[in-house]
């Protein structure tokens, strides 16, 4: 949520759009966590994964369609565009890693999945903060 807050404030978006994006992000995280923690039904895990991905699509819509116009009007489109692309590209890695990793179809080992999440976390948060 903090990355979206920073991007929304940078784009000088309205509070309703900011609240919607952060709410969708929290929904994505909570349903993604539920998908990872459910052990009773593999199908139910994928249902929660799908719901999480639907929340993610809503977040992507805000980042890629709504906020760029706000950033243009605010005069911050260059830095917003850089941070937006960094965020979108790295965040796309999380659902892919979940699906291929030990929580999903288990094509990747637990270690590779864990290192993948760690790498995405470091890049998504620290590189974002550095820029």
From Swiss-Prot:
Transport found in the keyword field: yes
Primary location group: membrane
Location of N6-(retinylidene)lysine modifications: 125
Topological domains, Extracellular: 39-41, 101-109
One GO MF term attached to the UniProt entry: monoatomic ion channel activity
InterPro entries (alphabetical): Arc/bac/fun_rhodopsins, Rhodopsin_retinal_BS
Keyword Cell membrane found: yes
Function: Light-driven chloride pump.
Name of the protein in question: Cruxhalorhodopsin-1
Organism: Haloarcula argentinensis
């Amino acid at each position: 949520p903090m990355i979206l807050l920073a991007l929304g404030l940078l784009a000088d978006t309205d509070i309703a759009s900011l609240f919607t994006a952060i709410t969708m992000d929290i929904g994505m995280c909570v349903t993604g966590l539920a998908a990872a923690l459910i052990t009773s039904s593999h199908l139910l895990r994928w249902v929660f994964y799908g719901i999480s991905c639907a929340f993610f699509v809503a977040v992507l819509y805000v980042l890629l369609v709504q906020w760029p116009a706000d950033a243009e009007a605010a005069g911050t489109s260059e830095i917003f565009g850089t941070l937006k692309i960094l965020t979108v590209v790295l965040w796309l890695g999380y659902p892919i890693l979940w699906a291929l990793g030990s929580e999903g179809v288990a094509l990747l080992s637990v270690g590779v999945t864990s290192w993948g999440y760690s790498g995405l976390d470091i890049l998504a948060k620290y590189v974002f903060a550095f820029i």
